[in-house]
Design a protein with these regions (language model features):
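Polytopic alpha-helical membrane-helix bundles and their juxtamembrane interface segments
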Residues: 1, 11-29, 35-162
C-alpha cells in the first residue's frame, strides 16, 4: 500500500501533465490490490474466532469485489470506484473484523489499526472536501500524506498484533 501511495502521488499526480489519466491506473490498481490483501489478512485473522461459513463468505466476496471494482475503474476511468473499494475494504471488512476481534481478544496491537483507520478517514475527507494548503500542495497531496501516516499505523498494528 505504501508503494501504491507513493506511485499514485508521484506518477498519478506530479506527472499528470505527462501521463494523463492513464498514469493514475497503476497507482489505483496497486492500491486496490493492497486493500484486497488487507481484507484477506483480516478475514484470515478473524477465522480464529468466526464461524467458518462467515470467513468463507467474505473470502469469496473478496475476489468478486476486487474484480468488480478494478473493471469498473478501468472501464470508466473514475477514481470514485477506487474510493468506494477502499471504504468497503478498509472500513467494512478490515475495521469491522478487527473491531470484533478486539472486543473478543482485547489485543492491544489492534489499537494502532483503529488509529490507522482514523488517518484513512482524514485522507478521504481531505479528498472529498478538497482540503489543501495551497495550489502547490493541494487536496491530493494532503490526502496522500494522511494515507502515508495511515499506512505507518497499519504496519505498526500488523507488527504488534497477536
Amino acid at each position: 500500500m505504501g508503494v501504491a501511495t507513493i506511485l499514485g502521488g508521484v506518477i498519478g499526480h506530479a506527472f499528470l501533465y505527462a501521463t494523463g489519466i492513464y498514469g493514475k491506473i497503476p497507482g489505483w490498481y496497486l492500491s486496490m490490490a493492497a486493500v484486497a490483501f488487507f481484507e484477506r489478512a483480516a478475514i484470515r485473522h478473524g477465522r480464529k474466532i468466526l464461524p467458518y461459513s462467515i470467513g468463507r463468505f467474505f473470502s469469496v466476496l473478496n475476489y468478486i469485489e476486487i474484480l468488480t471494482f478494478m473493471l469498473l475503474s478501468l472501464y470508466t476511468l473514475n477514481f470514485m470506484f477506487v474510493i468506494l473499494h477502499s471504504i468497503y475494504g478498509l472500513f467494512v471488512v478490515v475495521f469491522c473484523f478487527m473491531f470484533y476481534m478486539y472486543l473478543k481478544t482485547k489485543d492491544p496491537g489492534l489499537v494502532n489499526l483503529f488509529i490507522a483507520t482514523g488517518w484513512g478517514i482524514a485522507a478521504m475527507l481531505c479528498h472529498a472536501f478538497q482540503l489543501g494548503i495551497n495550489e502547490w500542495f493541494n487536496y491530493n497531496d494532503v490526502s496522500h500524506v494522511a494515507m502515508a501516516v495511515s499506512i505507518y499505523y497499519y504496519y505498526k498494528a500488523a507488527s504488534e498484533m497477536k
